Amino acid sequence: MKLLRIGEKNYEKPAILSKDGKIIDISSCIKDFNPDNLNFETISKLQSIDLSSLPELSSSERIGSCITNPGKFIAIGLNFSDHAAETGSKPPSEPIVFMKATSCINGPNDDIEITKDSKKLDWEVELGIVIGKHAKHISEKQSQDHILGYCLVNDVSEREWQIEKKGQWVKGKSHDTFGPIGPYLVTKDEISNANSLNMSCLLYTSDAADEQLS
């Protein structure tokens, strides 16, 4: 399934993109795609819904972030070898783990607010992984059973604040609007091999980034 949220900011409705491309309002079945509902039980429930009995939403309406109020927004730095080369860095031997504030989450097509005195605003297309159940101290193989689905994430950064001003990365990563997510949360069953996906980030009409995961 492709899940999305449609409507004005803070008033989005949860929806499903049907196989024939219609955006179906499922707000009568689920309140929102928030931590209370981002689980495998909810996905199973949604898969059994008769979409033909539910109202259609206009495709011209604003698309919000495909999830809202996640408990954590964890990211990995220098995750692509091409990006590491662009920055003059070697791929790290251990993952660089950092946090983005959940308050920076934004719709995929919403404006990005340029911070005051910003000189080095930057963007990175990333694959977001949505976790569907709690886990601690599990193996890499076991981790696959906890993935609910995938989404696109734009990891927006102010590089001067992030790197040149020293300290933790969060200050250059978490300004309001620095976390566009979506448009869709695609359930894991729809993607047989996430490593084969291609992702693109468009800046105006130019390809700002084009990455393959493998």
Task: Please state what every model-predicted region is.
Residues 17, 130, 210-211:
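Short stretches within intrinsically disordered, low-complexity N-terminal or propeptide regions
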Residues 70-206:
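Glycine-enriched loop-and-adjacent helix/strand subsegments that border the catalytic/binding cleft
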Residues 1-95, 192:
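N-terminal non-catalytic cap/leader segment that marks the start of a structured domain
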Residues 204, 208-214:
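Single conserved hydrophobic/aromatic residue that forms the stacking wall/gate
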